[in-house]
Amino acid sequence: MANTPHGGVLKDLLSRDQPIRGELLKESETLASILLSERQLCDLELILSGGFSPLEGFMNEKDYNGVVNDLRLADGALFSMPITLDVSQEDIDELKLKAGGRYTLRDFRDDSPLAIITVDDIYRPDKAVEAKKVFRGDPEHPAVKYLYNTAKEFYVGGKIQAINKLNHYDYVGLRYTPAELRQEFGKLGWNKVVAFQTRNPMHRAHRELTVRAARSRQANVLIHPVVGLTKPGDIDHFTRVRVYQALLPRYPNGMALLGLLPLAMRMGGDREAMWHAIIRKNYGATHFIVGRDHAGPGKNSKGEEFYGPYDAQKLVEKYKDELGIEVVPFQMMTYLPDSDEYMPKDEVPEGTKTLDISGTELRKRLKFGLPIPEWFSYPEVVKVLRESHPPRAKQGFTIFLTGHYNSGKDAIARALQVSLNQQAGRTTTLLLGETVRSELSAELGFSREDRHKNVQRIAFVAAELTRAGSAVIAAPIAPHEAGRKEARETVEQGGNFFLVHVNTPLEYCEATDRKGRFAAAKRGEIKGFTGVDDEYEVPSNADLVVDASQTQVRTIVHQIILLLESQGFFGN
């Protein structure tokens, strides 16, 4: 029998409101609409399905303040994470948002109506208090950054009525709602279920850990990975789900089940662990594995952890009776080569030989095509990871050349394209500054804002091509540090980026300017010309600095090729 939902009743709004769906759908077309962001969609999906029970909507001010300050909703029920719908003053004015009003919540992807919210209140949160009490206040914490840089200034609280489920087109058969998963447990005759939360690929150690946890409690295993929003830089959920599917047959027959959780993680450490436990209880689990530094975002720029290693376990353990789900502490597993088995580190006899591979080492082995031993991960899992993360020799990259007009960027770019074509194995795309201006950014001028937009567009195109395995050579002036930084971040989300500063002196660029652009700018005929009436900000983090006034193009191209070769882009 599945565990009792948090609060005693599963708030499955989809089932509750199905009888009046037609009326709600008709009404939704007459109401002002709030277009939900990706994170808000994740939250709404779990409100609608009952994953966030006992919530029936986004938190009003009383519930929000109770959760932030005391880990409790206004009625006293435990809840550790604020679930809020943020809006701007512009939204309030444009949509005429007010208490008592009804508004349609729509999916930003296809504008489909998902629900109607009846507003309880609109309030301005104290973000400093939320940042401090919920996420401990470190400005580098990703949730704190989100609060200050992305979340809007007001929150809207109110109960929701369901119209439609969110549309998903991937792994549909694995996307159980809490009610569906509870029904599945009933079909299988499962009474005790150990839920395992993960946002990473699983290897042999994870399999051994979960099997031990289940056997010691005579229970079954729910592998319940997050496929909503996780930590930037995490392996994409498509790859991870293929990994979990490959791993599943390695469990004893009938022991494990895979289900996907559309959660937007906050990386909130101890509070997030309690939240995860509540969610798994709503999905019917009786036990929940809480790991070391559970849902922590890692380290800040000073090398300090945001949370203590066992803070999460301590908080969930403290409230375990009220939560109504048993905590299973995550045991760090290690491999014993002499006996070919995994064992919890704290149980290994002194002097016994052990082997481990860190996450950093695994990424290195994937990046350079190095062997990954079978004692660490199953061959079928490694195969999936290698397909999604090919070695450097098969990865795409972007060479981003920046410098003054007439610095030699275009000549270097054209010569580099020929040299890379000679290497074979990749398509090569050239994005010259003037070509991009005429084909992609014809309507843009040369203001700081328009220059930034131009670089953003180049970065977007480069990122897509790089992700697909191409070599991209971009050669804009890109005079501003912020634009170049954003370009690097955009491309590096799916590939490799190298910034080459073509540091040819401004005087040389002007003296050899056969088209007379510098002279025209000085006469005032061209506005916003870099080096005349717009400053060029020297890159602080270039991967290579060259000077076309002192070095031949052939030599510069060779330097770039050597840089790529040193990073493994042309094989062993």
Curated annotation (Swiss-Prot):
The keyword Isomerase does not apply. The adenylyl-sulfate kinase (APS kinase) is non-functional. It is involved in allosteric regulation by PAPS. PAPS binding induces a large rotational rearrangement of domains lowering the substrate affinity of the enzyme. The record marks H203, H206 as: Transition state stabilizer. In the N-terminal section; belongs to the sulfate adenylyltransferase family. It holds the Pfam family APS_kinase. It is found in: Cytoplasm. InterPro entries: APS_kinase (IPR002891), ATP-Sase_PUA-like_dom (IPR025980), P-loop_NTPase (IPR027417), PUA-like_sf (IPR015947), Rossmann-like_a/b/a_fold (IPR014729), Sulf_adenylyltr_euk (IPR027535), Sulf_AdTrans/APS_kinase (IPR050512), Sulfurylase_cat_dom (IPR024951). This is Sulfate adenylyltransferase. Catalyzes the first intracellular reaction of sulfate assimilation, forming adenosine-5'-phosphosulfate (APS) from inorganic sulfate and ATP. Plays an important role in sulfate activation as a component of the biosynthesis pathway of sulfur-containing amino acids. Coiled coil: none annotated. GO terms for cellular component: cytoplasm. Sulfate binds at Q197, R199, A295. Pathway: Sulfur metabolism; hydrogen sulfide biosynthesis; sulfite from sulfate: step 1/3. Allosterically inhibited by 3'-phosphoadenosine 5'-phosphosulfate (PAPS). The keyword Nucleotide-binding applies. The record marks F330 as: Induces change in substrate recognition on ATP binding. Disulfide bonds: none annotated. Its EC number is 2.7.7.4.
